[in-house]
Amino acid sequence: MLETRCKYYENEAMFHGFIPHIMGTRFDILLIHSDIDRLNTLWADIAYELERLDKILNRFDPHSEVSKINNHASQSKIQISKEMKSILQLCSYYYETTSHLFDITLKDFSQIQLHEHSYISFTSPDISLDFGGFAKGYALKKIRKFIEQENISDAFANFGNSSILGIGHHPYGDCWKVSFLNPYNQSL
């Protein structure tokens, strides 16, 4: 069972949802709206979706779909879900358009074989899938759709300070302010 927390700040019409451990990090979201019931429902949908995606993409969970692929695809063709097939096709597109810099195999994406009827195999036993550089961004795109479907115009989501989504405005300003350290000068 996924541990989640949330709190509504009535004066600001701000909802804060928090998951301490999902996809290898923490997740926070701020949703600005006055309808608390609507926000609670949206939060439940978001938390459910994050847990669902974690069960597909978390290579550290031995029961996840990616773990099953990593454990068996070098030995024989195995069937994958339609969503996993779509994710792999998207990752293949990123692999090609980045001149092979984006590679979820950490070796050579070309050694993944996608077969008809949603089957996958690896041509080498050294290949495994790691969605660490992909899963949080993919999840944020899904979350954005949930937020837009509810016509929430102001929201901010943060995955462990490495992947963020800002929509609209902060309740006390023109935008959601973000900052990050300059890796070449930590004093800035």
Where are the language model's segments positioned?
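Mature catalytic core of soluble alpha/beta enzymes
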Residues: 1-188
